[in-house]
Amino acid sequence: HYTRSNLEKKILKINPDIILFYGWSWKIKEKIFKNYKCFMLHPSLLPKYRGGSPIQNQIIRGEKMSAVTIFKINEIMDGGDIYFQKKISLMGSLSEIFKRIIVAGTKGTLKILNTKKIKIKKQNHNRATFFTRRKPEQSEITIKEIKEKPAEYIANKIRMLENPYPNAFIKLNKGKLIIKKFKIK
């Protein structure tokens, strides 16, 4: 298992030709991406939604479509050249979205590994948007949100916080009500 602290040591020991960072949440040290061919999978239509919690940040903002992007890591957070990008739907449950990400990510990885000449696309950094990783306390559905936000917003907040993420909840006098499923009628 690789962690932020043991990554460099393990990479130096293995000395790989290519490194794929899929599901990785930390910045890669320059020593690594300068000396190895490093790719990252990011579930957004880069350069939009760079940074943490891209799936949640897109869903809560009402996005219906996204993409799976595989890019070469450089010194800019989620800012490297794009080697693969495929649009995916953000509709349905989180597990359905994950399946789409896996299928598109697998196809993209195989294309990168098996194609001699790939059309590389530079990112337009002027069009980039950046978001921070969501915190567990942001999973709360507040009374203010219930009163002021449309039902679709609340539904999206619940949907984007399905397992494995900290589920949506409402604070009660003695504890909290965790919400895992919803139905709009």
Regions found by a protein language model. Give the residues of each.
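One-carbon transfer enzymes
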Residues: H1-K185
